[in-house]
Design a protein with these regions (language model features):
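Short amphipathic alpha-helix that is part of the acyltransferase structural core
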Residues: 1-10, 39, 44, 98-99, ...
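N-terminal charged segments
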Residues: 1-66, 79-80, 138-139
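A short helix-loop-beta-strand connector motif used in the catalytic cores of GNAT acetyltransferases and
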Residues: 15-21, 69-70, 83, 95-98, ...
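Conserved beta-strand in the GNAT
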Residues: 26-33, 93-95, 100, 158, ...
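Acyl-donor-binding surface of acyltransferase catalytic domains
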Residues: 49-124, 137, 243
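Conserved acetyl-CoA-binding loop-helix of GNAT-fold acetyltransferases
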Residues: 53-61, 182-187, 191-204, 208, ...
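Conserved GNAT acetyl-CoA-binding A-motif
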Residues: 67-76, 206-217
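Conserved active-site alpha-helix within GNAT-family acetyltransferase domains
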Residues: 80-94, 196, 220-239
Length: 245
């Protein structure tokens, strides 16, 4: 995937999971969301050839330290080639190697009658989603604020059985792509194909809203999800990792 294509997909993902505040400096985007998720509280290159000097590093990290948060660097292929080694030399740990995957929305993506997709997150959806996610109680309002601030067409998907919510996921359309985020299944309901049904339904929903491709971000060690995504035609187009103090 070319740098231009990577930048476009990065932009789509940023808008699909919006931070509460963003700043663009020196070819990097600083994202802030009160410490809720690394994705929304990280420093990200948005241009090939982004500046990376000691002075630039200090300036990019400063607002995080002032807020009492660790400066988290998210290194995609757009980051300067030396960034990973420089941060490692400063003692920053490399964590959560992740894959960005994409698939054409072909016949493998079809709506499932058990999957409900709403245009806005109601209180029950938010409570159920938060209950299955690792979000800390003090971050739940931030999470809700971020979800409500998504400007693109969004589908809040869920599966219920006997009045009990068993699974959730999020789909966000931007042009010809739909992003799939945070597929969560209750422990007691796993290994029943609910993640597949959510993924297929969100893909079909995205296609109905003009998308031709689905994309997602998945941790490279997620051995439960990777075979499912491969079966649905997802292929890795690039990867990224975090460096944290």
């Amino acid at each position: 995937m070319s740098p231009v294509e990577i930048r476009d997909l990065e932009r789509k993902a940023f808008q699909a999971w919006p931070a509460l505040e963003t700043r663009a400096n020196f070819g990097w985007v600083q994202r802030f969301a009160g410490g809720y998720t690394k994705r929304a509280n990280s420093i990200n290159a948005i241009e090939a050839g982004a500046h990376f000097t000691p002075a630039v590093m200090a300036e990019l990290e400063r607002p995080y330290r002032e807020r009492g948060h660790p400066p988290i660097w998210r290194l995609s292929p757009l980051a300067p080639a030396e960034a990973d080694a420089v941060l490692a030399g400063r003692g920053y740990r490399r964590i959560d190697q992740s894959l960005v995957q994409r698939a054409p929305l072909d016949e493998r993506f079809s709506p499932d009658p058990v999957v409900r997709i709403a245009a806005s997150p109601g209180p029950e959806w938010l409570a159920g989603f938060a209950g299955l996610s690792p979000v800390a109680p003090h971050h739940r309002e931030t999470m809700a604020q971020m979800l409500r601030s998504i400007a693109a067409p969004v589908g809040f998907a869920s599966v219920e059985e006997g009045g009990e919510a068993l699974a959730f996921a999020l789909g966000v359309v931007d042009g010809d792509h739909v992003g799939l985020f945070d597929v969560l299944v209750a422990p007691a309901a796993r290994r029943r194909g609910l993640a597949r049904r959510l993924t297929q339904s969100i893909g079909a929903w995205g296609r109905d809203h003009g998308a031709c491709f689905a994309y997602l971000q998945v941790v490279a060690t997620n051995i439960a999800a990777l075979p499912l995504y491969a079966d649905l035609g997802f292929e890795t187009v690039y990867s990224y990792a975090y460096r944290v103090p």
